[in-house]
């Protein structure tokens, strides 16, 4: 019983459940100012879009980084020379034989 009384005392001290009376006669409901709601939503969307753009750029940079695939660290105790991987040249799939003939002319 003592726990219940102390909980009620805490709730009353925090002003939970109290009736609010305004001098204007309006009900004290939660009024939402849509201007600030739209501003907050726009800021949240802008931050999210910026974060997504940053992550996409980081992933693209990591995928197309030529130096990261060619460089390897030397493990301890092994020789100092490690053969580097050679990359195959990229093919241009949009290039056709007809284009080659046009270029030769």
From Swiss-Prot:
Pfam families from the UniProt entry: DUF4514
Membrane topology label: Single-pass type I membrane protein
Cellular compartments per GO CC: membrane
Stretches of the chain found on the membrane's Extracellular side: 20-38
Transmembrane regions: 39-59
Topology Cytoplasmic: residue spans: 60-105
Stretch forming the signal peptide: 1-19
Highest taxon of the lineage: Eukaryota
Keywords noted in UniProt: Membrane, Signal, Transmembrane, Transmembrane helix
Main location: membrane
Protein name as it appears in the record: Transmembrane protein 273
Organism in which the protein naturally occurs: Homo sapiens (Human)
Phylogenetic lineage: Eukaryota, Metazoa, Chordata, Craniata, Vertebrata
Gene that encodes it: TMEM273
């Amino acid at each position: 019983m003592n726990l219940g009384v102390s909980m009620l005392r805490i709730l009353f001290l925090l002003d939970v459940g109290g009736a609010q009376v305004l001098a204007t006669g309006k009900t004290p409901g939660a009024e939402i100012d849509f201007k600030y709601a739209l501003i907050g939503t726009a800021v949240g969307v802008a931050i999210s879009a910026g974060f997504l753009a940053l992550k996409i750029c980081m992933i693209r940079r990591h995928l197309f980084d030529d130096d990261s695939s060619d460089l390897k660290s030397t493990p301890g105790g092994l020789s100092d020379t490690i053969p580097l991987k050679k990359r195959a040249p990229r093919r241009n799939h949009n290039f056709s034989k007809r284009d080659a003939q046009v270029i030769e002319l």
